[in-house]
Amino acid sequence: MELRKLKRGKSEKTDNKVAYIFLAPWVLGLLGITLIPLGASLVLSFTNYRLTRRTFSFIGFDNYVEMFHDPRLWQSIKVTLEYVVIATPFQLAVALLIAVLLNQGMKGLAFYRSVFYLPSLMGSSVAIALLWAQIFGAQGLIPTIFAKLGLIKSFDYSYIGDSRTALITIMILHIWTFGSPMIIFLAGLRQIPTMYYEAAAVDGAGKWTQFWRITMPLLSPIIFFNLVLQVIGAFQSFTQAYIISNGRGGPVDSTLFYSLYLYTIGLTNRFEMGYASAMAWLLVVIIVIFTGIAFATSKYWVFYED
């Protein structure tokens, strides 16, 4: 018995060592890539640290107070909120529409699903942002077509060079990358039992009624998941605005996203990492508030099947 217990003890110790070995990369990654930088940024947010200066000192809440008096920061918040509030619902609506169409049992589903998912893979790339700038810029594809149709006066008109339309072009790019939420919607639609639709059809319910009375309530948890995911992602948008505006957020700060302004403060113009760190934590607070609102209101429109 004692020999068996001894062998079992050695075996358990070996298993524990193996478990620790496999867990080590994840723990080290969590510490090195997430927790330590997170803690460092919090500490830096209370300092006047600059990349161009070796020494720094603690200044308390001065960085946070300065944010309230920074007009460009408030402009970046305004631009980002417009982007999140307008582009995200439109993107989810397009994703849901395409998912519903693909769920009708059409042939070649795998092909169409792959085609519609491609924009999500490419949409945040530098190449697509450059292409977008060419399409909507002066003498680009869109101005050329609209000029020939007589909708605008000149081929030289630039949608990305006009403060009234520059943000809209980036919103269109965001909406175009609907593939990721579409795949999630499609997976949710395929989980809805067909017997509900059959029973509704027997009762005389049309397709539109079935959609609002069956599909939407049963799909509401998926809609909620996609909404939270896309809102968090939209708040952190950077690449498209950086490329299309040449890193300036123009014209007239009309595409000055919060992440873009944070980048210019910390890594390009002023190199004020202390202030940039404070801005990063403000962004965390804003995202938490919006996510909290989504969770708090979900009980009124998200339904879970018993």
Residue ranges, per PLM feature:
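A structural signal for multi-pass alpha-helical bundles of membrane permease subunits
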Residues: D15-D306
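Short, Lys/Arg-rich, polar N-terminal cytosolic tail immediately upstream
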Residues: M1-T14
